[in-house]
From Swiss-Prot:
RNaseP catalyzes the removal of the 5'-leader sequence from pre-tRNA to produce the mature 5'-terminus. It can also cleave other RNA substrates such as 4.5S RNA. The protein component plays an auxiliary but essential role in vivo by binding to the 5'-leader sequence and broadening the substrate specificity of the ribozyme. Gene3D superfamilies: 3.30.230.10. Coiled coil: none annotated. One of its GO terms (biological process) is tRNA 5'-leader removal. Belongs to the RnpA family. It catalyses: Endonucleolytic cleavage of RNA, removing 5'-extranucleotides from tRNA precursor. Its EC number is 3.1.26.5. Consists of a catalytic RNA component (M1 or rnpB) and a protein subunit. It holds the Pfam family Ribonuclease_P. This is Ribonuclease P protein component. GO terms for cellular component: ribonuclease P complex.
Length: 114
């Protein structure tokens, strides 16, 4: 994923958390906010409660790859944050991918044409 499509700054995360719409399932929480651009910016958060750094990094890599492969299905113009819950530690790639798609559908962010 290109650097321009990433949420990295603390102020960007705070803005999304403050003015967001959110939804959750057993693996993830999603926060979205319209950003005024013609592309999405995405951030991934994994708390220290989830596990040690190796585990957190693995979960972030799985989240990133799941989103990257399904990015063309997602409507553009949003800041999106995915927050991993403790149950992500034991989840497979397919479970994480289906959780991401489930939340994106619930938030009406999946293009109907794809």
């Amino acid at each position: 994923m290109k650097a321009i499509n990433r949420l990295r700054k603390n102020e960007d995360f705070r803005k999304v958390y403050k003015k967001r719409k959110s939804m959750a399932n057993k693996l993830l929480i999603i926060y979205i906010l319209e950003n005024g651009y013609n592309f999405n910016r995405v951030g991934f958060t994994v708390s220290k409660k989830v596990g040690k750094s190796v585990i957190r990094s693995r979960v972030k890599r799985l989240l990133n790859e799941s989103y990257r492969l399904n990015n063309e299905k997602v409507k553009q113009g949003y800041d999106i944050i995915f927050v991993a819950r403790n149950t992500c530690v034991d989840a497979s790639y397919k479970e994480i991918e289906s959780a991401i798609l489930h939340l994106l559908k619930k938030m009406n962010l999946i293009n109907s044409a794809v």
